[in-house]
C-alpha cells in the first residue's frame, strides 16, 4: 500500500513549495494538486521535477485546479469549450506520463447541472480513452456537490461504462454526502484505484488521522476484500491541521494502522 499526502493540504502555498515541504518531512508518496496551468511547463515544472528526483518521491496522482470548470467545459453543450479543456487535460497526461503519475482525479459535473447522463458518459469515456494512451487512468471521485455524490449515479456509470471506468473514493466527501464509505467500496469493488483519506467524528468531517473516530481497521478489512493494494493519500484542508509536521505524522499514523491491521488480516 502506497500511503502519502496531497500537496492540496498546503494550499494556498505554491505547488512546488508545498511539494518541497512534504519532501523535507520525509513524505515519499504524493498527489500533486496543480493550481495553475503554467505549473505544467517552464520553471515551475523544472522545479517540481528537481524535487521529485532529488528526494526520490513517488508521484501517484494529479488533481487539476480546473475541477469547477468541468461542468461548463468538459460536460457542457458548447463544443469549443469541451475541446479546450480536453486539450488542457491532455497536457496533464503528458506530464503525468513523464513523472510516472498514474491517476488523474476527476470531479465531474455539479449536482445542479442539467448534463444528460448520455453526454456525461460519452465525455468521460473519451477522456478515459485519451488518458489511457499515456498510461494514465481518469478516475471519477465521489464529490458531495457533484453528480458523483449519488450512489445511484456511480452505479449507472459502472453499468454503462463497464470496464472503462475507475473511481477515487474520498472519505470526507462520503461523510458530507451522507454515504457510507464501506457501502461505496462494496459497490465499486475492484474499480477503486485511489483513496483520499481523513479522519472524522460527529463534530468534524475532516480531521488528521488518529484525531477522530473513523474505523480504519474496518477500512483495511474492506479493502482486503476487493484486493486493493494501491494508493492511500491523506487529504486535509488547511484549517483542519496545525502544522506541516502533522501531515507527515498523518501518513506515518496510517502506515502504523495498516501494519497492525494487515497482521490481523493475515
Positions of PLM-derived features:
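Short, acidic/polar
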Residues: 11-22, 84-93, 180-184
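Acidic (Asp/Glu)-rich catalytic clusters
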Residues: 19-24, 43-63, 93-99, 128-133, ...
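Conserved, mostly hydrophobic/aromatic
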Residues: 22, 30, 52, 96, ...
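Acidic/histidine-rich catalytic cores of soluble enzymes
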Residues: 29-30, 62, 126-213
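Conserved small/polar residues in nucleotide/adenosyl-binding loops
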Residues: 263-266
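Catalytic domains of carbohydrate-active enzymes, especially glycoside hydrolases
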Residues: 18-35
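Active-site acidic/histidine proton-transfer and metal-coordination neighborhood
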Residues: 16, 54, 71-166
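Acidic-and-aromatic substrate-binding clefts and catalytic sites of carbohydrate-active enzymes
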Residues: 8-15, 33-44, 111-116, 144-149, ...
Amino acid at each position: 500500500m502506497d500511503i502519502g499526502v496531497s500537496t492540496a493540504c498546503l494550499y494556498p502555498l505554491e505547488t512546488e513549495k508545498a511539494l518541497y515541504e512534504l519532501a523535507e518531512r520525509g513524505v515519499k508518496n504524493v498527489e500533486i494538486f496543480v493550481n495553475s496551468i503554467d505549473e505544467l511547463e517552464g520553471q515551475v515544472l523544472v522545479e517540481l521535477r528537481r524535487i521529485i528526483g532529488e528526494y526520490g518521491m513517488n508521484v501517484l496522482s494529479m488533481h487539476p485546479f480546473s475541477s469547477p470548470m468541468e461542468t461548463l467545459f468538459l460536460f457542457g453543450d458548447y463544443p469549443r469549450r469541451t475541446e479546450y479543456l480536453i486539450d488542457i487535460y491532455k497536457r496533464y497526461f503528458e506530464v503525468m506520463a513523464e513523472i510516472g503519475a498514474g491517476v488523474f482525479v476527476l470531479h465531474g459535473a455539479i449536482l445542479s447541472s442539467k448534463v444528460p447522463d448520455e453526454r456525461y458518459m460519452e465525455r468521460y469515456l473519451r477522456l478515459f480513452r485519451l488518458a489511457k494512451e499515456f498510461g494514465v487512468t481518469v478516475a471519477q471521485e465521489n464529490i458531495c456537490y457533484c453528480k458523483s455524490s449519488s450512489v445511484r449515479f456511480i452505479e449507472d456509470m459502472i453499468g454503462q461504462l463497464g470496464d472503462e471506468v475507475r473511481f477515487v473514493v474520498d472519505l470526507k466527501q462520503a461523510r458530507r454526502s451522507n454515504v457510507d464509505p464501506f457501502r461505496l467500496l462494496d459497490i465499486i469493488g475492484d474499480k477503486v484505484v485511489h483513496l483520499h483519506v481523513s479522519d472524522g467524528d460527529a463534530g468534524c468531517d475532516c480531521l488528521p488521522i488518529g484525531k477522530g473516530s473513523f474505523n480504519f481497521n474496518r477500512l483495511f478489512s474492506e479493502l482486503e476484500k476487493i484486493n486493493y493494494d494501491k494508493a492511500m493519500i491523506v487529504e486535509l484542508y488547511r484549517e483542519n491541521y496545525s502544522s506541516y509536521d502533522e501531515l507527515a505524522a498523518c501518513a506515518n499514523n496510517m502506515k502504523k494502522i495498516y501494519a497492525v491491521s494487515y497482521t490481523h488480516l493475515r
